[in-house]
Amino acid sequence: MSRYVFTSESVTEGHPDKICDQVSDAVLDACLSEDPTSRVACEAVVNTGLCLITGEITSKAEVDFNKLVREVIKNIGYRSASDGGFDANSCAVLVALDQQSSDIAQGVNEAEDHSTDPLDQVGAGDQGIMFGFACDETPELMPLPISLAHRLARRLALVRHQQLIDYLLPDGKTQVSVSYENGVPCSIDTILISTQHKSEVDGITLEEEIQKRIAKDLWKFVVEPATEDLPLKPAKGSTRFLVNPTGKFVIGGPQGDAGLTGRKIIVDTYGGYARHGGGAFSGKDPTKVDRSAAYAARFVAKALVAANLAKKVEVQLSYAIGVAKPISILVDSFGTGKVSDSELTQLVQDQFDLRPGAIIKAFDLQNLPSIRGGRFYRDTAAYGHFGRTDILLPWEDVSQKAKELSLLK
């Protein structure tokens, strides 16, 4: 019998790196809402009292970047110096944006395929490799460790916003270790929550007593509600529960650590359970295959698992800048496939159009911000881009495609 423990982590929206992801995607939403053809590559940096946005944007949209950045930071919860040491109203906002390079633009605007098909004329915005993954460990076909870590992080933010625990501050991290037997989750080994908090908790000032109170409240208001509908639940007697292992977490957010866009790519995807091509998502418009092709790869993998063609699937795609069709497609079912991996790969090549233009069209990636009232990508920037049950994501809806694949068996 094979036994092992696998661990994944998540972070809350108030984590410095996640602030940056949300700022970058808020800029993307604003540009695409007014001009769906906008080319955006927006990076953000936060530090004590500072938010810088930089990168390349070519767009007809008129955006008040200063106002937008402050609104994002304020909505996260950094409304004053007492809300974690970072203040949306008084922090400096610096904007240093250029236009997209004409050399890159020509490859995206007119692919090298010399085809009359409009979808062949949208080239990949860069070279690169992307991975998509799905497995049958959860209803949303995600690995259990990252699914649980996101549940806890979302719940941690919710109880803060709703003041169910009134001493919590925006920065926080979760980590979940799951025990497996023969590749199947069998128990939750460890839950770790690090959460920023006020220096005084309901009149308690002794550090040891504060941490005991926080641990008690987090189990009651975060862990139990976040896992109540799961068949595999943490057990108070056997699941190790760690809270703020350093002893306290008062200094946090950008005051405690600098943040950068794109530094939580494993949190954004599969929690380390599957491979990653290295490209971040946030702040990138859909012509960047780092983002759009990773979404498509997830769609392919999830459809294959939903169609019961395999219990676990990883899909690799690769692209060349300025070329529409993928350079390569590879499917790995880890020995769980109903047919061989080569047959699954051929099936993907035959049944999925993975040109950037086709992906953008199928998921309506350029129009989603305006369709959703000016905000879409920003909502993907915290708590993962895959397996979401709280927001509607087109690459997660595989029901129709899974039916079509089932008929091909």
Curated annotation (Swiss-Prot):
Query: What are the names of the required cofactors?
Result: Mg(2+); K(+)
Chief site of localization = cytoplasm
- Tell me where it resides: Cytoplasm
* EC annotation from Swiss-Prot or TrEMBL: 2.5.1.6
One GO biological process this protein is involved in is: S-adenosylmethionine biosynthetic process
Q: Which reaction does it catalyse?
A: L-methionine + ATP + H2O = S-adenosyl-L-methionine + phosphate + diphosphate
Residues at which ATP binds: H15, D171, G172, K173, K248, F249, D257, R263, K264, A280, K284
UniProt region (Flexible loop), positions on chain:
100-110
In which pathway does this enzyme or protein participate?
A: Amino-acid biosynthesis; S-adenosyl-L-methionine biosynthesis; S-adenosyl-L-methionine from L-methionine: step 1/1
Give this protein's Gene Ontology molecular function annotations.
ATP binding; magnesium ion binding; methionine adenosyltransferase activity
Q: Which domain of life is it from?
A: Bacteria
> Can you tell me which residues bind Mg(2+)?
D17
Keyword list, A-Z: ATP-binding, Cytoplasm, Magnesium, Metal-binding, Nucleotide-binding, One-carbon metabolism, Potassium, Transferase
According to the record, how does the cofactor bind?
Binds 2 divalent ions per subunit.
The residues the record assigns to binding L-methionine are E56, Q100, D257, K288
Identify which top EC class this enzyme belongs to.
transferase
Q: Per the record, GO CC terms? A: cytoplasm
Residues that bind K(+), according to the entry? Answer: E43
Q: Cite the record's note on assembly.
A: Homotetramer; dimer of dimers.
Give the family this protein belongs to, as stated in its UniProt record.
Belongs to the AdoMet synthase family.
Q: What does this protein do?
A: Catalyzes the formation of S-adenosylmethionine (AdoMet) from methionine and ATP. The overall synthetic reaction is composed of two sequential steps, AdoMet formation and the subsequent tripolyphosphate hydrolysis which occurs prior to release of AdoMet from the enzyme.
According to UniProt, the name of this protein is S-adenosylmethionine synthase
